[in-house]
Swiss-Prot record:
Enzyme Commission code: 4.2.1.20
One of the record's GO cellular component terms: cytosol
Protein name from the UniProt record: Tryptophan synthase alpha chain
Recorded catalytic activity of this chain's protein: (1S,2R)-1-C-(indol-3-yl)glycerol 3-phosphate + L-serine = D-glyceraldehyde 3-phosphate + L-tryptophan + H2O
Gene name per UniProt: trpA
């Protein structure tokens, strides 16, 4: 598998997509955390590019973004970090369209997409990008062989959902609940119905928003998901380490253990094949 082959990350069973904020609390720490998450079983890294108005995020990730911005994280520093990642897994850039549009000396997303492709990014998740206005970013991604992952929410209409399924590449991001990101104690009751509405498509389906434990990961894959997306649980772990002044190596060990729990839980949700 090459780093640009995002869909292939789902080929060998349920995929674990792990989100962290680039530069929280430092770029060096983020690189160490990514290595730990991959060691723990992560199949795809969703690396957040900090933006000052993260409308889809809850308090946990908003605070992480502020820490990263206060520490000096910029789009160029983000690309430098991606280029230094050694892990042989796809890296997806999660950010907001304004950053992509304003990068470089001309309006439009093409300049950042080109730079991201050179750095090693495999695709994008842009939650504030309306599907009907996604043409320029889709064209830029297609030109560089990158995926553009659309987010299907519980409130997405059937017509718009089908449009997203036609255009998404790599996988489809299934928003497991209404609202913003943040760890929850229970899987939303709406998740099985959301997945059932997508079973007619072959594109891998990964559920995010609120996943924080191995048991939740099991429930989600048992409901038909091809993967789980986890963010706030990791970011909470990083925040606790920052608050306690723990060295990055200690935080990395905790992240590795959490990823291993989540990966194992996701695998338990899929029935083992029958042996004849």
């Amino acid at each position: 598998m090459t780093r640009s082959d995002l869909a292939a990350a789902f080929d060998d069973g349920p995929a674990l997509v792990s989100y962290v904020v680039a530069g929280d609390p430092t770029p060096a720490a983020t690189a160490e955390y990514i290595d730990a998450l991959v060691d723990g079983g992560t199949d795809v890294i969703e690396l957040g590019l900090p933006f000052s108005e993260p409308v889809a995020e809850g308090t946990t990730i908003q605070n992480a973004i502020k820490r990263a911005l206060d520490a000096g994280m910029t789009p160029d520093a983000y690309l430098d970090l991606v280029a230094r990642i050694d892990a042989d897994v796809p890296v997806v850039c999660m950010t907001y369209y304004n950053l992509l549009f304003q990068y470089g000396d001309r309006a439009g997303p093409a300049a950042f997409v080109s730079a991201a492709a050179e750095a090693g990014v495999s695709g994008f998740v842009v939650p504030d990008l309306p599907v009907d206005e996604s043409g320029p970013l889709r064209e830029a991604c297609r030109a560089h062989g990158l995926d553009l992952v659309f987010v299907v929410a519980p409130t997405t209409t059937a017509d718009r959902r089908e449009r997203m399924l036609d255009l998404t590449t790599g996988f489809v991001y299934v928003q497991g609940r209404v609202g913003t990101t943040g760890a929850r104690e229970e899987v939303s009751a709406a998740t099985p119905d959301a997945l059932a509405a997508l079973q007619h498509t072959d594109i891998p389906k990964a559920v995010g928003f609120g996943v924080s434990s191995g048991e939740q990961a099991r429930e989600i894959t048992a409901s038909g998901a091809d993967g789980v997306i986890v963010g706030s649980a990791y970011v909470d772990t990083v925040a606790d380490g920052v608050a306690d002044d723990d060295p990055p190596s200690v935080v990395a060990d905790r992240l590795r253990d959490l990823a291993a729990e989540l990966k194992a839980g996701a695998a338990r949700g899929v029935p083992e094949p029958e042996h004849k």
